[in-house]
């Protein structure tokens, strides 16, 4: 081809840098050095010693002669034994010449100058399986190449091209040197290939091809469609990471397909009982897909057959290597404007179109009626043991592997196809560690909120989804792949403009005040290539789950106040139910007090007040108090004396039956399931005289746990023994510290 693509310069530069770091299997990064190279340093050391002795004018044998002479005393000073010494030197010289002649074929007479030590190279990827069959060579070769190239952040298009060229070279070479013939019962069994030797051959071919492409780069056309992806995976609370995922946006380049529309392949595999089945499926399923006869005209059926072939071959491998594991899997294959999905088990994929979740599949679980009937027809059973399980063991009804559970747990995949009309937003592929705790609508909200907060930047969307699943209580491995089917930056801008028009006359925003003025012009450009978050095995960068909490908060959602700096408690209307934004300073607890009992209590308090000595400020006006529980009927009393705080004293106990009716006014706090238990000192309502506006004085708040309301307060340092009080225009500021999980709000005066 005479043309030149814009990326060629970038690709050449990458190859130059890559060759500077990657010197092939013989450049120091070999998994296991050749055993023949170990005994070489010994003769080289002897030769260097001999050369040094010659350079100093002494014979190599003189040292030994000198030692012998020293042991004999002063005999070496006598002139008589000179002939004997000459004979010894001659014999020693003859022996040295014989040694030099024997070492001459292997070493040159003059040792080469010492070469500078090269920096240590990163280890090459090692194959996880010791032996493979001939049918598995292609998948293993492609996987080894892609692992090595992606480790150096190779562009996806170039990585696919290099992996394809390397795999073709390996397949055309003679693999008989790597074969291990195996005999069983006197008959020739399956011929297997040693993967370590195959890996050396693969990396040697890769190095040769990179050197050739630097000089003469084969020009190719770049794909027209390139899907933006965001990937994140964590081990979470499990001891091992058994999830695997695959992203091949350049499917045509990886398999050298020139007559097909643009194609892409994405998959998530969730292993159980070990990671071998998940690794095997991630390496070989897409290869088995391309090799199916119906792949050109019926990709959905080809996907189902690829699952079946992968399952059969892994069961054979498990029998040879005594493996007892399996994996679920979900695959999405995009060809042009068609989306094809195939799956086994409970890993799932969902489509989002115009901001709404679209169901594409139903996971294979034992509690599905059709799956239960299939299992029982085969002689199995579905029982409840913490979850619905097949024969009391596995909680999935279909999987790759699990040979000991066949045929009840089969590897037959289901498939579905959907036409993409351009209104689709993105796909979310994930394992059950995500979908068991996050429903589709919540996932859509998490993605939407993240895109709005980050001006359409989608690189960390998968991280946000994983964090939401973990905060919702997931302890399993979590893997999430988000594939964006269109430019979400434009979609976010359009939605923001429409929301701004709708909310411009409603007196404020509901997005936490993050309007155009706070964001400014900090929009990030849309990435031009795949932007995938690293699929690490741990959970990086997380200090506390509060930072990543989204709509899945277990407590009530805290809405942002109109004025973010302070709140005027005297402006609260008793006729409106109180939200979790704030509560008035005096709030009753329980289902609501009878008016009769409240009036009796208030009248008695008036009599108590008349008997108390007059205090300063007693004649000042008093504001109203709201008595009752949140969201229920509220009794409003104007210009009354403050409510007594002594509900636990003798006066309360002397009320008899009336006290029992007022029991719900007493503070009661049940033991929490998690965390610590509060033990407040005061069982009283908020009542204070001359409120101070100094920072550090806390107000009490009403909290809810289960079906009970509780009101907790700390002591008021300016008047600890106050029996009455009033409230002026009290301004309070929100606290910056993280409150107790049971307190959805916290303020300071």
UniProtKB/Swiss-Prot annotation:
Residues 46-55 have a biased composition (Low complexity). Residues 21-128, 495-537, 608-627 are annotated as: Disordered. SUPFAM superfamilies: PP2C-like (SSF81606). It comes from the Eukaryota. Residues 224-485 form the PPM-type phosphatase domain. Its cofactor is Mg(2+); Mn(2+). Mn(2+) 2 binds at residues 270, 432, 476. Residues 31-45, 69-102 have a biased composition (Acidic residues). The keyword Cytoplasm applies. The keyword Lipid biosynthesis does not apply. Pfam families: PP2C (PF00481). Its main location: nucleus. It catalyses: O-phospho-L-seryl-[protein] + H2O = L-seryl-[protein] + phosphate; O-phospho-L-threonyl-[protein] + H2O = L-threonyl-[protein] + phosphate. It is found in: Nucleus; Cytoplasm. Residues 110-126 have a biased composition (Pro residues). Heterotrimer. Interacts with PAX1 and ARHGEF6 (or ARHGEF7). Belongs to the PP2C family. Protein phosphatase that inactivates multifunctional CaM kinases such as CAMK4 and CAMK2. Dephosphorylates and inactivates PAK. May play a role in the inhibition of actin fiber stress breakdown and in morphological changes driven by TNK2/CDC42. Dephosphorylates PRKAA2. This is Protein phosphatase 1E. It comes from Mus musculus (Mouse).
